[in-house]
Amino acid sequence: MTMNKSKLLEVNLRDFLEIRGEEKTHNLLDNFDSKYNEDVNYFLKTKAEEFGKRGLASTYLVFTKYKEKLEFLAYYSLAMKAVVIKSDANISKTLRKKINTYSNFEPKLKSYVMSCHLIGQLGKNYNANDESLISGSELLELACRKVRAAQEISGGKFVYLECENVKSLINFYEKNGFTKFGMRKLDKEETDLNGSYLVQLIRYLK
C-alpha cells in the first residue's frame, strides 16, 4: 500500500483481495463506473483479478479518506510490453535520441523496439461521493510515479499508453507530457472501442 502527500492511498488489487476477501472486493469493483468508457469498467470487473494472478498486469485501486470512510476514487493498470516505434515517426530529435538510447533498432522493420511499461487502463470512479477528489491528471501522475519506482529497480525511462482517436483525449495526454508516435489497429476482442485503431503515445520519465 502507498499513501502519497495528497492523502491518496494506492492498493494493489491482489493485496486488497487478500485483506478484504473476494466478496467485499467484488462488491467494491461492481460499484465502479467510469461513465465514459465501458472498456475501463469491463477490464476492472472481469479481467483485472485474473491478469494479476497470471502476472500479465498489475491493477492499483486508489482511495482517499472521505467522511471517516475509505472512498474508492479510481484505478489504473500497468503491464510490460514490447513497443515498436517507426523510424519515420513524427517526433522531436530530442525524443528520438532518447528512444535510440533505450531501444534496439531493427533494420528490417525500420523501427525501434524496446520493452516498456504500458498504462493499460486508467479510470475515475464516477460513483464516488465526490468525483472532484482526484483529477485525471493526478491519476495519470500516480501511474507514472509507480512506473518510475519500478524503473528504479529494473531500469528503463519510458512509459506509453494507447487511447481512442479523440481530440480531447489526445490533448489531455499531450498536456501531461506524452507524445504521439503511432497508431495500432484494434484487435478483434476490442469491441467496446470506437474507430478501427488506437493512437499510441509515449513519455520519457525523468
Q: What residue spans do the PLM features occupy?
A:
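Non-catalytic substrate-recognition and accessory regions of acyl/acetyltransferase enzymes
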Residues: 1-130, 145-160, 164, 170-206
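Glycine-rich acyl-CoA binding loop
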Residues: 131-143
